[in-house]
């Protein structure tokens, strides 16, 4: 029920992770690169921080890849497949890919979520948690308080 501090990283080395944790003190490190499952387990233990692994769902085979993170990441973040840059691309994926998924660990939904579609996404997928970035921006990189408020209201009213 609270907003938590999340830092998005892509294939970070240990020195960068140490600097991030020391400076920002995030609640969560969200990994959007090609990090190995074991690396997330080590990072979580070493820095005493939650680790989330973003999985781009372009097709059902990505769910097989996701299963390799069970017991290593604290949560999976199902997102649209990366375009040019990982994370925050503003594109939804085919939520039907989650219909038959036996995820077996905590997960969250991301990818193209906005105030006008997040309630439907939650109802369609049963997502226990949602993640947003560009869906609450008035311009690239500029968060809009009215959009954030509308997004949070839509999430609260989705259930």
Regions found by a protein language model. Name each.
Residues 22, 45, 120-123, 153, ...:
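Short, well-ordered alpha-helices that flank and scaffold nucleotide-derived cofactor binding pockets
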Residues 1-109, 113-117:
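Conserved anion-binding
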Residues 107, 124-125, 148:
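Alpha-helix termini
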Residues 116, 122, 127-136:
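Internal alpha/beta core interface subdomains
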Residues 41-43, 133-159:
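C-terminal helical cap(s) of enzyme catalytic domains, especially alpha/beta-barrels
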């Amino acid at each position: 029920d609270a907003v938590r501090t999340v830092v998005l990283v892509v294939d970070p080395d240990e020195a960068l992770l140490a600097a991030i944790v020391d400076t920002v003190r995030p609640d969560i490190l969200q990994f959007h690169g090609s990090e190995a499952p074991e690396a997330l387990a080590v990072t979580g233990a070493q820095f005493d921080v939650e680790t989330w692994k973003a999985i781009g769902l372009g097709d059902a085979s990505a769910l097989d890849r996701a299963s390799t993170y069970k017991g290593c990441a604290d949560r999976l973040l199902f997102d649209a497949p990366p375009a040019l840059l990982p994370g925050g691309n503003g594109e939804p994926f085919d939520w039907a890919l989650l219909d038959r998924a036996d995820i077996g660990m905590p997960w969250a939904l991301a990818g193209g979520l906005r105030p006008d579609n997040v309630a439907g996404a939650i109802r369609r997928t049963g997502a226990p948690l949602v993640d947003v970035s560009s869906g609450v921006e008035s311009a690239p990189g500029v968060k809009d308080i009215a959009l954030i408020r509308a997004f949070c209201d839509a999430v609260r009213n989705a259930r």
